């Protein structure tokens, strides 16, 4: 159905490796279950793709280090999606950020 909506001008992939090997793709957005984030990020960097990844970056510190090593080795950009970090509401939970900041700065 999605293909009909865009008149057959987008590609559908059943395997992420096919997507990252596509020369028409410049950047990948990783929005999969967290256990895939590290694997996909490393492979995307190796394939020369810049990466936009949803939280959490990886499941472990070791996986995160491997991602950063791959990003540096292959000269790619990595961006972790951190929406609502700088808005009036903290992560959309209805908690104002400024009172929290004052509380932290007060030393409590």
Per-segment meaning from a language model:
Residues 50-54, 58-108:
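A contiguous active-site-proximal alpha/beta segment in oxidoreductase catalytic domains
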Residues 1-53, 62-77:
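N-terminal glycine-/serine-/threonine-rich beta1-alpha1-beta2 phosphate-ribose binding loop
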């Amino acid at each position: 159905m999605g293909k009909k909506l865009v008149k057959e001008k987008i590609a559908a992939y059943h395997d992420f490796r096919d997507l990252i090997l596509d020369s028409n793709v410049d950047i990948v957005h990783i929005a999969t279950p967290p256990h895939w984030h590290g694997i996909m990020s490393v492979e995307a960097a190796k394939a020369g793709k810049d990466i936009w990844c949803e939280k959490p970056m990886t499941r472990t510190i070791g996986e995160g280090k491997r991602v950063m090593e791959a990003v540096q080795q292959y000269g790619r950009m990595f961006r972790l999606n951190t929406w609502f970090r700088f808005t009036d509401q903290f992560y959309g939970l209805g908690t104002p950020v400024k009172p929290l900041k004052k509380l932290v700065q007060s030393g409590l």
